[in-house]
Amino acid sequence: MYNLLKGTWALFFGVGMMMLANGLQGSLIGIRASLEGYSASAAGIILTGYYAGFLLGALYIPQRIKNVGHVRTFAALASIASISILIHSLHISFLGWFIMRFISGMCFVGLYTVAESWVNDLSDNEHRGQALSVYMIVSMAGSAFGQLFLYIADHETATLFMIVSVLISISLVPILIVVSKQPDFSVAKFFTVKELYKASPLGVVTSIMTGLAHGTLWGIGSIYGLKNGLSIEQVSIFMFTFVIGGAINQYLVGYLSDKYDRRTIIVIVAFLASLFSVLAVL
């Protein structure tokens, strides 16, 4: 496990910077849309653009990785994502923001694919759960601490958009200059949803349900906070606590998944998540 982390520190650092940026931009755009006078429905549609791009990118980007490799794909997508967030501050319109969110979604699903396939390739089955849990800890911690950047600048200026762009650009540096073994993507096989469901029904259903819940909170969590009287600083703390809780829990879940039946762990974690969600609204 130590050797794995030693060989992938550049990747994990890049992921951390990338997720700082993504965590900040998700809440920032929701807040800024509200400040610009968009209704909750309109803001929700704008933010949905990210997930539409995410879905399309999941079908298109793997072929790009196969053709040009992990490092070049990561560099290209990070550069496009960095540009797209700056355009948000240059041109404020419903359609313009939707398109930029769509492009950002395509870029980030590609960045996730590069990072996760890289980690997966470098870990054996005995330690895969722990390796992926470390990846998720870095990812979610980055997203969580990204929320706190809302404290440092005026939300009605371009400063926070620039900070997001800078963080994305920084994520490139260690990956481009540190030589590391790259996965062989030449044997990658595309799986249909039907094939995935046949291989792991519980995994597919859990992924869909988790995506629905996760996307809803990420998409309108900041707007919900503002509409219910929270200040922008309180919204950042609200979103931070949601994400950091997941980060803290990741390694334990990954460790248990390496020791016990992963289906059992999924059921237990899903039950606990549902229970605490119900308690939160009582």
Where are these predicted regions, by residue range?
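Helix-loop boundary and gating motifs at the non-cytosolic
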Residues: Y2-Y51, G203-S207, H214-Y224, N228, ...
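Residue-level signature of mid-helix packing/kink "hotspots" within the transmembrane helices
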Residues: Y51-L59, S143-A144, V243-Y251
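Helix-to-loop junctions at the C-terminal end of transmembrane segments
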Residues: G57-G69, D154, N249-D261
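Helix-breaking motifs and short loop linkers at transmembrane-helix boundaries and internal kinks
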Residues: G69, L90-I92, D261, L282
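Structural signature of the two symmetry-related core transmembrane helices
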Residues: R72-I87, S165, T264-L279
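Paired small-residue
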Residues: L95-I103, F276
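Cytoplasmic helix-loop-helix junction between adjacent transmembrane helices
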Residues: F102-I137
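C-terminal membrane-cytosol helix-exit motif in multi-pass small-molecule transporters
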Residues: L150-Y151, S165-F185
